[in-house]
């Protein structure tokens, strides 16, 4: 109806991201052995159908742009380059409007701001921070961001907009606000923020300013993908003691949750010479997206500690030598089919670790060469049926709604791939329908 395009070409294997000519895949645990016992696997992950060269980003526009254009065709007034700064409340406590700062539409300032902010977004997202030359692209991005902020500082006008039927806060989360992350989720402060420049927590602050309450502010989703290359997932992931704690083939958000929430943010992939050789070969598979190849090679070359024996590796990294030896022997036995794996890992996804030298790759929250992408889950508490923001007594604040990452939502306890679009569409429609029903 709105011209957002999807495609049925499917990628059936485990992967952090499908090849660029596949648009339906498994962004979850459905292919993991222990999960397959509970439910038949189904590829539920849809990428928007758009040809984007070799880039794995920028696909959201294929969904957003048609929805935006449809809304504009229906009469929506869109205020570009406008920031909400304050809510207006009447004597009964109802939210009736918002104070905004706007760069005048069509002005020279607006033209320059649009150009600068687009360039800032391009360069800031160009390379993961650990990759060579990332400091250069990030520096260029910050240069353009400062130019855009300078225009904001002198070129904006104050306006008040009346909200006759309701006001919806949907400004994203707060992962790009270091102070908020440090306050609410300090264990993830060294992760790599995964969001847009707008994820500053502004909507949460606005809601709190009129009595809105928050929840789950310390809940963070962390994404630790180690496949590709499959050789890493075929090896073992251990904690600071040298113990396994998970099936290594689980979805990246599941592995990241285990590491960040249950292992003190510290974990390593331990693999042997055979796995290292296989990983180099797999990194050059033409089916990989460039960022998968580059990150794999970077970590194979720079992110490892190496030793001739398991015991020497344990001493070098700081594992308990006896624990690491027992972990590897138990894993090798399960990989050979001599005993079941305690984490129900599929034997087809296991390779014995027998050929020295042995390697340990840091996949912790603070890993230097393998940054851990993180997003925020917490936000304003809302009434489930309507999306109205709740106050300290658990009562709805009249006229004030919240949606998306600004609010606590269906997926605020655990990551579900695609939650940003899916939850925004669902929670936005819920608020709109409640407003429409109230005015019938």
Positions of the model-derived regions?
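Mobile, glycine/GP-rich and aromatic-enriched active-site lid/loop segments adjacent to catalytic centers
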Residues: 1-157, 165, 179-181, 196-200, ...
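Glycine-/small-residue-rich beta-strand-loop submotif within the FAD-binding core of flavoenzymes
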Residues: 176
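Short hydrophobic core segments
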Residues: 161-173
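Hydrophobic/aromatic-lined pockets within catalytic cores
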Residues: 72, 172, 208-211, 436, ...
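A conserved FAD-binding loop/helix module that cradles the flavin
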Residues: 179-204, 407-439
């Amino acid at each position: 109806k709105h011209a957002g395009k999807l495609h049925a070409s499917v990628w059936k294997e485990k992967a952090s991201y499908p090849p660029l000519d596949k648009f339906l895949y498994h962004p979850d645990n459905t292919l993991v052995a222990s999960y397959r016992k509970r439910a038949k696997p189904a590829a539920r992950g849809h990428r928007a159908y758009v040809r984007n060269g070799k880039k794995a980003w920028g696909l959201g526009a294929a969904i957003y742009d048609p929805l935006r254009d449809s809304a504009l065709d229906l009469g929506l007034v869109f205020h570009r380059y406008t920031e909400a700064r304050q809510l207006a409340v009447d004597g009964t406590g109802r939210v009736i409007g918002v104070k905004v700062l706007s760069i005048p539409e069509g002005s020279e300032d607006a033209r320059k701001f649009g150009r600068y902010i687009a360039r800032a977004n391009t360069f800031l997202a160009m390379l993961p921070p650990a990759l060579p030359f990332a400091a250069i692209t990030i520096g260029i991005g910050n240069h353009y961001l400062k130019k855009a902020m300078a225009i904001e500082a002198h070129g904006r006008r104050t306006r008040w907009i009346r909200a006759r039927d309701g006001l919806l806060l949907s400004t994203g989360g707060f992962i790009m606000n270091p102070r908020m992350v440090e306050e609410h989720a300090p264990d993830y402060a060294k992760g790599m923020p995964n969001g847009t420049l707008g994820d500053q927590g502004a909507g949460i602050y606005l809601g709190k300013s009129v009595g809105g309450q928050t929840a789950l502010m310390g809940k963070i989703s962390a994404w630790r993908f180690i496949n590709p290359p499959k050789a890493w997932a075929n090896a073992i992931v251990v904690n600071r003691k040298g113990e396994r704690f998970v099936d290594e083939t689980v979805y990246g958000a599941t592995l990241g949750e285990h590491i960040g929430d249950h292992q003190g943010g510290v974990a390593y992939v331990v693999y042997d010479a055979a796995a290292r050789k296989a990983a180099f070969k797999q990194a050059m598979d033409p089916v990989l997206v460039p960022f998968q190849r580059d990150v794999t090679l970077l970590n194979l070359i720079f992110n490892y500690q190496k030793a001739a024996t398991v015991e020497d590796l344990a001493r070098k990294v700081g594992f308990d030598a006896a624990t690491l030896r027992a972990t590897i022997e138990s894993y090798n036995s399960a990989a050979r089919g001599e005993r079941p794996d305690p984490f129900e890992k599929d034997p087809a996804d296991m390779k014995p670790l027998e050929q020295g030298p042995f390697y340990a790759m840091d996949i912790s929250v603070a890993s230097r060469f393998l940054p851990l992408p993180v997003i925020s889950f917490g936000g304003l508490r809302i009434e489930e049926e309507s999306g109205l923001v709740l106050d300290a007594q658990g009562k709805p604040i009249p006229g004030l709604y919240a949606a998306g990452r600004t609010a606590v939502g269906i997926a605020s306890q655990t990551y579900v791939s695609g939650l940003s679009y899916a939850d925004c569409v669902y929670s936005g429609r819920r608020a709109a329908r409640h407003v429409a029903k109230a005015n019938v």
